[in-house]
Design a protein with these regions (language model features):
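A short aromatic-anchored loop/beta-hairpin motif
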Residues: 1-115, 119-175
Length: 175
């Protein structure tokens, strides 16, 4: 949003996975990383990749600046391991080696987004930023999360709330 001063979050679309009195946690879903690739991560973890996995390009996203060496998988809920955080009735988040192994074997969830790191807020911080118009809130959308072209996610998220990105301004209160 125009009032977001932190360059790590400029034009970011973040799916908030948890938000309570203690704080909030979310994953940036529109910042694809050039490196490492999913196959490189599998090699580092010494996890064999199936033939299908090697031929399928699995993107890796910068999920946020916290715990950037840790993988977080946002996914559809037909997959629900014991350690899955159920976010809503369609989406879960799992951060285990087990789901990475299943993705490598081609047996993981139907829809998934692999992110390194997460965006985190302390108690009341996200609410405060929302009140200052640093963020806009959009209803969850499976297509936006899993199927939309990465470079179009920000514009598509704004369209969902009736905002034209071209009309946004970083200036306010000047006559």
């Amino acid at each position: 949003m125009p009032t977001m001063g932190d360059p790590r979050f400029v034009r970011s679309v973040i799916y908030v996975c948890a938000h309570n009195a203690d704080g909030a946690l979310g994953l940036i879903i529109n910042n694809k990383m050039n490196s490492p690739s999913f196959l490189e991560i599998l090699e580092q973890l010494e996890i064999p990749a199936s033939h299908n996995t090697k031929n399928e390009i699995k993107d890796v996203y910068f999920g946020g600046p916290v715990e950037t060496a840790r993988g977080f998988i946002l996914h559809s809920l037909e997959y629900n391991a014991g350690d899955t955080l159920v976010v809503d009735n369609e989406i879960g988040m799992t951060a285990s080696l087990g789901i990475i192994k299943e993705l490598a074997a081609g047996t993981g969830p139907n829809n998934s987004l692999f992110a390194l790191g997460y965006a985190g807020w302390g108690a009341g911080q996200l609410d405060n930023e929302m009140q200052k118009n640093a963020w806009l809130s959009v209803d969850p959308d499976l297509d936006l999360i899993f199927n939309e072209v990465v470079d179009l996610k920000w514009d598509k998220a704004l369209e969902k709330v009736g905002v034209n990105a071209a009309l946004l301004s970083t200036e306010s209160g000047h006559a």
